[in-house]
Amino acid sequence: KVRKVQEKLGMSRTNKAIVGPATTAKIKEFQKSMGLSQTGQVDYTTWNALGLSDDDWHNLGSYVSPIQITKNSTKNDCIETMISRAYDYLGTEYIVGASGQPGQGVDCSGLVMQALYSVGINPLPVSVIRHSQPGYEYESRNLFTSSKFKTVSYEDRQRGDLIFYSDQNGTIIHIAIYLGNDQVIEAWPGKVVVWPIKNSHRDRIAGVRRVFN
């Protein structure tokens, strides 16, 4: 939703779809021009005034991948389903704070959330709606501390594990899904890609979490 609003307001396209000061100022400016209450927030009235659709208002920013397993699915079935769902996003644009459908835009934690949803795992309080709110852009940090996943050693990593990366200060900055053979699938600035588990962009691995024990 934020990306669509920014485009309608004529703002430059970046990889961040976040309501920051610049976006808020633009919204207030538009609301003033339309005789609307200048809140800086896009409610339904402002959304319609921008010429955006009802369908997008009700559906964008709340997409959850449908569950693709059954009660008879094995652990391996679940791992492969989760990875297959992540592959559906290959080439999808990287947008900070996004967790949309394939082709709409995701960031690293948005991609992982959709993969988890496909196997019936809801990582609350982490959610697609919260993820789009200011202050929750980097949900990888909250997934890292979640009690829903088992901590395993880097040496014990297996296909389907979640790989977390940190900056030089130890702050979690990124998450990817391990594919095996030292490859991961991840959303990285640009688009969703398959890359080596370590490369020049991010090589500080903070930890590994197992989704299926």
At which residue positions do the language-model features occur?
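Terminal recognition/anchoring or ligand-binding modules at protein termini
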Residues: Q41, D54-N59, G190
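Non-catalytic cell-wall polysaccharide-engagement segments
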Residues: S200-D203, G207-N213
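Secreted/periplasmic proteins that engage bacterial cell-wall peptidoglycan
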Residues: P21-K28, T81-L143
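Soluble non-cytosolic domains of exported or imported proteins
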Residues: R3, A17-A22, Q41-Y44, S73-E80, ...
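Sec-exported extracytoplasmic/periplasmic mature domains
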Residues: E7-T14, K28-L36, G51-D55, Y87-I95, ...
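Short acidic, glycine/serine/threonine-rich helix-capping segments at coil-helix boundaries
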Residues: K1-L52, P125-I129, Y178
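Acidic, Ser/Thr/Pro/Gly-enriched interdomain connector segments
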Residues: K1-A17, W57, G61-D77
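...with weaker cross-activation on analogous glycine-rich loops/strands in unrelated enzymes
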Residues: E80-I83, I121-V194, F212
